[in-house]
């Protein structure tokens, strides 16, 4: 599920809810990106909070039990996003995702 992030009539980013596992797990993974010129304005934490509310609580949403956000350890901006929304750190997934030609750890 993909949503566009818009600011003053301009598309500035994207947020998605993927890897949705229904049934007994009821989990999903949130992913996002934002244009460099719009980073740091609070748009991404707002989008994450809105998507989380919809995915977890809204009767029209998938009514998930758990959401994950996976980031590369050195991505400080993404780390700030997850801190602002109150996400809990659970550890490192070693060689979790293939990014730019190499297997990368994610937190």
Where do the PLM segments sit?
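Acyl-donor (CoA/ACP) binding surface of acyl/acetyltransferases
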Residues: 2-107
């Amino acid at each position: 599920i993909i949503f566009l992030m818009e600011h003053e009539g301009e598309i500035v980013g994207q947020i998605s809810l993927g890897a949705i596992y229904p049934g007994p797990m009821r989990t999903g993974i949130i992913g996002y990106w934002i244009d460099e010129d719009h980073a740091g304005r609070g748009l991404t934490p707002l989008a994450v909070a809105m998507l989380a509310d919809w995915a977890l609580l809204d009767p029209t949403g998938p009514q998930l039990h758990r959401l994950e956000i996976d980031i590369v350890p050195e991505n400080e901006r993404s780390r700030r996003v997850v801190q602002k929304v109150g996400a809990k750190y659970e550890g490192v997934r070693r060689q979790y995702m293939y990014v730019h030609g190499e297997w990368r750890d994610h937190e």
